Amino acid sequence: MSEPRFTRPALWEDVLDLARRLNRQGARYVLVGGYALAAHGLVRMTTDIDIAVAPDPDNNRRWVAALAGLPDGVAAELAGEDDPFAGDLLHAIRINDEFTVDVMPSVAGVSFAILEQHAEQLLIDGEPIPVLDLQGLLDTKQQSERPKDQADAALLREALARLSPAPLLSPLDSGS
């Protein structure tokens, strides 16, 4: 009898491996969630990788093919489906492979088309990864009622405030 297999927490090496697979397939995706925060230097504990994907049939085939190549091949079950999100009330697919990948066509009501406009191409260990920018992360996090997302939103507001240029001072009124 074989040993039961369990999903382990995702590591940065897994993010890089996933990005390589998605890039090789030409998939349109954006890294969101905890690892997107970490890519910007805002580290908090996370155990899965969250990606948003363009929800069209061609791209669905591309990201499914990429994820089907993960060690346990769990995503292969989705091969051949033009719309793997059909009928999914939460509009998220959780791929519990060697590590967990949550795949979403939108995040907190924000469409992939909008998320893609807020993606920055970051080169991480030689791999280009489209990562949701700080403002995009804030926009999605503050839509959530989960305590960890509210904490992330507070951290993002602080980071954005620190990165903003100092406000311009208005000229002093000479009183005349």
Residues covered by each model-derived region:
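Compositionally biased terminal segments of proteins
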Residues: 1-176
